[in-house]
Amino acid sequence: MLHNFLHGSGTITPQSSRHSPEPAGDPDTNNPHTMPANPRRKRIVIAMTGATDALLGIKTLLALRHLNIETHLIMSKWAEATIKYETDYHPSNVKALADYSYNINDMAAPVSSGSFKTNGMVVVPCSMKTLAGIHSGFCDDLISRTADVMLKERRRLVLVARETPLSEIHLRNMLEVTRAGAVVFPPVPALYVRPGSVEDLVDQSVGRVLDLFDLDIGGFERWEGWKR
C-alpha cells in the first residue's frame, strides 16, 4: 500500500523560505494562521536528519498523508543529502508530501512555539547529534527547538534512533531523553513478519511508530502468536 502510494507522488515544490511555512497547495487555504482553531485535523511534526534510513521518514510522511494527518516537515541539509544518496527521490518531492515544510534555520516557524498546538513529533531518522542536542536542551536549529517544545509541553516525542553499535554516551543520552518523556524507537527489523523485501521491514517500523500516536495504518503484519 505505502509502496504504491510513494511511487505515485511526483509533485515538486520550491524550498521553504526563512520565517515562512511552505504549503503543498494554495497558500491562502493552507496557511495555519487562517485555519479555524477547532475542529482541526491532527497535526504531527516530522523531522528528518542525516542519519541513514531516509526511507523511514519518507514512508512516515506517506502514511500520515494517507490518514489525512496534517504534517509539518523539518529537514536538515544532511537529510537532503541522504535522501539523494539512498533513494530515487529529490528532497523537493519529499517536501511536497507534507502539508507544510520549514527551513531548519527558521526559528520563528509556528512549530517552534508551544502555543502552536500539535499532537506530537517524530524525528525519523534521528542522528546521534540530534539526540545529543535534544538531551542537552541546546536548541540551535528548528529540529532541536521543536523537540524541546514537545518535552516541555508534555507532548509525544518519538526519536527513531539510527546508529549501531552504541557508545556509553549514546546510551546515556537515550536514557535521559526517555526520563524527560521521549520515546526512543530503534527501527529493529521484525523478522517474524517473514519480510519479502526491505520495504516490508520499513513499513512494519513505520506502523509501529504510528501505533505510539494511536494511529493504525494497516497494511503490515502484526504478531498474533505462533502460526502452525
Q: What is each PLM-predicted segment?
A:
Residues 2-158, 164-228:
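A cross-family phosphate/adenosyl-ligand binding-site feature
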